[in-house]
């Protein structure tokens, strides 16, 4: 776990990190049972929940949802035209990649309405309890207000690497680019002419610079959060990495965008990938 020693020098009070090697072995550092705010990593849980609902037959990704002309797929892929916050569109659906907390919240509400239950109950019944994520709670907006531990996030990572809650074809769609070739902004990184996104998860593509490493494949998917957190899975080399901290990203963004890729490259090198 030499790569994980890099987090010892991060300018944060508390950090817990891990990586999963191609053989499934897990290396960790830091307090694995400490609860952190995941921030936007929560969006991945919304996307996975919707896909469970799709497999159950209660929703379709092509359901009308959100602004006129918008579908559930648009909402999850940040292609709805909604702004970061607010319910008044600033662009037509499918025309730009506009990162939107509101879009994710509307996707979660659409699923909840279809299921006839609150979204936090659906999340608990659909993901948290089946995966044994007993320390994870939704404490507000499903777009960013989930608290969890490294142990629990690793349980979700195992599901992403080897799905059992959704059909394999459904799982593949999660990390497949939706509405290809849309330009847009990744908050904290900048604007990209090609800004690929899946269904609640960012896809690395050819973005440069990026918060993942130079050794990560373009197929790498995941999310980083404003709470100073990150999760990525590289399906090409079958390596995953998680790092949770207690320092907001905005307070150390320049350092984070140097240190996070360095960690990713070190993890991949240690895995021999």
Predicted regions and their residues:
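Active-site helix/loop module of the DD-peptidase/beta-lactamase fold
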Residues: 37-41, 45, 53-89, 98-99, ...
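Well-ordered alpha-helical segments within folded domains of soluble proteins
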Residues: 45-47, 102-109, 151-155
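A generic beta-sheet turn/junction motif
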Residues: 52-54, 235-236
């Amino acid at each position: 776990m030499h790569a994980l020693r890099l987090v010892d020098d991060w300018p944060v009070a508390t950090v817990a990190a891990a990586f999963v090697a191609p053989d499934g072995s897990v290396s960790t550092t830091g307090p694995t049972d400490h609860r952190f705010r995941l921030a936007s990593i929560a969006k991945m849980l919304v996307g996975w929940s919707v896909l469970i609902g799709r497999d159950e037959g209660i929703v379709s990704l092509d359901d009308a949802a959100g602004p006129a002309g918008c579908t559930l797929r648009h909402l999850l892929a940040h292609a709805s035209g909604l702004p970061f916050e607010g319910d008044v569109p600033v662009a037509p659906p499918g025309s730009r990649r506009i990162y939107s907390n509101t879009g994710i919240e509307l996707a979660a509400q659409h699923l909840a309405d279809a299921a006839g239950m609150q979204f936090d109950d659906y999340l608990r019944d659909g993901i948290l309890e089946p995966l044994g994520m007993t320390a994870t709670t939704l404490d507000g907006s499903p777009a960013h207000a989930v608290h969890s531990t490294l142990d629990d996030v690793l349980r979700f990572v195992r599901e992403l690497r080897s799905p059992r809650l959704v059909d394999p074809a459904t799982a593949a769609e999660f990390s497949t680019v939706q509405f290809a070739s849309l330009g847009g902004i990744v908050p904290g990184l900048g604007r990209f002419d090609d800004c690929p996104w899946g269904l609640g998860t960012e896809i690395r593509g050819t973005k440069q610079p990026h918060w993942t490493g130079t050794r990560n494949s373009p197929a790498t998917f995941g999310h980083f959060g404003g709470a100073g957190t990150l999760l990525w899975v590289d399906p090409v080399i079958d390596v995953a990495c998680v790092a949770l901290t207690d320092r907001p990203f905005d307070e150390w963004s320049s350092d984070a965008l140097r240190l996070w890729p360095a960690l990713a490259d070190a993890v991949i090198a240690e895995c021999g990938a």
